[in-house]
């Protein structure tokens, strides 16, 4: 055969050839290749001949390495091939008929699935366990009943198979049987053995009762309930996978860990979801199991769930849990805001409703009005600040004109201004309030007794006469500096008793009553 460099060198020449020439050239190269291969094979055969004898001698002495399989694999492989002779040889050489693979499957299980009646008979004669359980507690009768092999079911029942055997799903052979004839055979056999519904329920409860006894014995011995068992699973994993509600409740009562993980990172909720145990899913979630817990493969309980009913239940529980978390988060944030603003007056006031705020203001003004209703002190009050004077000047009503025919009704001694103006004011406008002083009721002047009966014209004339007799004051007068006998002596002594900027007292707008009545003292403020 041509070398690589030779082939590369002739490529330009081959590219210029016609189709027929290229075909002939390829056939020539192929003939050379076959010739070279035949020569190499001949040389290889000549070299192998002398070495065969030592290899056979080494094999006879057991010095060469060989592939050997365990007896369980060999027996199951022969039974699966329905090789009666080979199985008989294995059983005759001392191989146990109950050998199982990694899933707990025995040769008898496999033959019941494959419907090998003669092989089943041979294994039973060799002493095979007729009630052998695999990893999911399936017996050979479970396998035969599920597959509907009537003659195998009859053979197993005749050999003493357990009709009440329960697998990990809580199913008995008759629960898994869909064939009518096979089901009739099972029910007839159960009736012949006197099996009732009570005995069936008692048989279903046996695994859980056994686990409950085991848990109680561990509790009495003070053993750790969180200790991992096979494959790193805890007792709660086992109870969740098998649907043992009472056992799981007992474990949770003694604070079994809901977040314990097995070797695959599965929590008990993963196991309950994978094996479709709806009551256990609800129980674990109610005790705080994490619906978003992830395994080593980043799988949540919802990811490993294969049953639609369980999946729907998980989604429902997840939605409820998320809604509850959102509600709790809003409540915590509200409490946090209230706690942080407890020392801030502004935030507290903003949280008060309008009705509550109005009631608060009304209560404050009512208390202030009660204070102002008290009799004024006999001693002169000190002059108020400029703020009080400014406030009184701003709140003082304009003086009435004589040409104005409108007469203002006396309202609790207040003159002028809108009756609603000072309803919610912080400071009482004393410059527009005039009231007869009870302290001056004993004065000999008849003006005090007859004042309520003067007409408006008489009152104006008296005010004008008083203005001519008294020089204009520079500021507010005290009760001691006021001249006796003047109408101004009858007013309540207050720092800013209504004098305007020019010193003129305001004119009262009063109307004479139709019937004489004693003077009544009324509060100076209108209480709403």
UniProtKB/Swiss-Prot annotation:
PTM annotation (Cysteine methyl ester): residues: 525
Positions where Phosphoserine occurs in the chain: 433
GO MF term list: enzyme inhibitor activity; myosin phosphatase regulator activity
Region called Disordered, residue ranges: 19-59, 330-351, 367-421, 462-505
Residue numbers covered by the propeptide annotation in the UniProt entry: 526-528
Stretches with biased composition (Basic and acidic residues): 40-58
UniProt cross-references to InterPro entries, sorted A to Z: Ankyrin_rpt, Ankyrin_rpt-contain_sf, Pase-1_reg_su_16AB, PP1_Regulatory_Subunit
Keywords recorded for this protein, A-Z: ANK repeat, Cell membrane, Coiled coil, Lipoprotein, Membrane, Methylation, Palmitate, Phosphoprotein, Prenylation, Repeat
Keyword S-adenosyl-L-methionine appears in the UniProt entry: no
Lipidation positions, renumbered (S-farnesyl cysteine): 525
Family annotation (Gene3D superfamilies): Ankyrin repeat-containing domain
PANTHER family: PROTEIN PHOSPHATASE 1 REGULATORY SUBUNIT 12 (PTHR24179), PROTEIN PHOSPHATASE 1 REGULATORY SUBUNIT 16A (PTHR24179:SF30)
Self-association state and partner proteins as the record states: Binds PP1.
Protein name: Protein phosphatase 1 regulatory subunit 16A
Gene (name only): PPP1R16A
């Amino acid at each position: 055969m041509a070398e690589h460099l030779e082939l590369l060198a002739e490529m330009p020449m081959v590219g210029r050839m016609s189709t027929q020439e290229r075909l002939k050239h390829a056939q020539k190269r192929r003939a050379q290749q076959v010739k070279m291969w035949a020569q190499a094979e001949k040389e290889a055969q000549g070299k192998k001949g002398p070495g065969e004898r030592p290899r056979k001698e080494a094999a006879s002495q057991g010095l060469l390495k060989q592939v050997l399989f365990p007896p369980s694999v060999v027996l199951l492989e022969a039974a699966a091939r329905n090789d009666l002779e080979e199985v008989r040889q294995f059983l005759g050489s001392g191989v146990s008929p109950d050998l199982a693979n990694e899933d707990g499957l025995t040769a008898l299980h496999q033959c019941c699935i494959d419907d090998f009646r003669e092989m089943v008979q041979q294994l039973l004669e060799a002493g095979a366990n007729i009630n052998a359980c695999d990893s999911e507690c399936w017996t050979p009768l479970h396998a035969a009943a599920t597959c509907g092999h009537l003659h195998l079911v009859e053979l197993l029942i005749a050999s003493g198979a357990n009709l009440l055997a329960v697998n990990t799903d809580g199913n008995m052979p008759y629960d898994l049987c869909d064939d009518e004839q096979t089901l009739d055979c099972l029910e007839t056999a159960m009736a012949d053995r006197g099996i009732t519904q009570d005995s069936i329920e008692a048989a279903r409860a046996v695994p859980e009762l056994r686990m409950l006894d085991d848990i109680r014995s561990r509790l009495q011995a003070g053993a750790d309930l969180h200790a991992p068992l096979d494959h790193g699973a805890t007792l709660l994993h086992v109870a969740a996978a098998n649907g043992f509600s009472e056992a799981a409740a007992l474990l949770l009562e003694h604070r079994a860990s809901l977040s314990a993980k097995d070797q695959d990172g599965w929590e008990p909720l993963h196991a309950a979801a994978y094996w479709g145990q709806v009551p256990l899913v609800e129980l674990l979630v109610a005790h705080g199991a994490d619906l978003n817990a992830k395994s080593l493969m980043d799988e949540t309980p919802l990811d490993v769930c294969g049953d639609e009913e369980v999946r729907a239940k998980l989604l429902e529980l997840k939605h409820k849990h998320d809604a509850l978390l959102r509600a709790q988060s809003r409540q915590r944030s509200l409490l946090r805001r209230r706690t942080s603003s407890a020392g801030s007056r502004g935030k507290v006031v903003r949280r008060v409703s309008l009705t509550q705020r109005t009631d608060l203001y009304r209560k404050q003004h009512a208390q202030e009005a009660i204070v102002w209703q008290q009799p004024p002190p006999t001693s002169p009050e000190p002059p108020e600040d400029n703020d009080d004077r400014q406030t009184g000047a701003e709140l003082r009503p304009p003086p009435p004109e004589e040409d104005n025919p409108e007469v203002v009704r006396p309202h609790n001694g207040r003159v002028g201004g809108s009756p609603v103006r000072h309803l919610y004011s912080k400071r009482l406008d004393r410059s527009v309030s005039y009231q007869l002083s009870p302290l001056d009721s004993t004065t000999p002047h008849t003006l005090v007794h007859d004042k309520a009966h003067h007409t408006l014209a008489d009152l104006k004339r008296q005010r004008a006469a008083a203005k001519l007799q008294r020089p204009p004051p520079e500021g507010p007068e005290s009760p001691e500096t006021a001249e006796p006998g003047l109408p101004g002596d009858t007013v309540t002594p207050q720092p800013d008793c209504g004098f305007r900027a020019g010193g003129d007292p305001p004119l009262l707008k009063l109307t004479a009553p139709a019937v004489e009545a004693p003077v009544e003292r009324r509060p100076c403020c209108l209480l709403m």
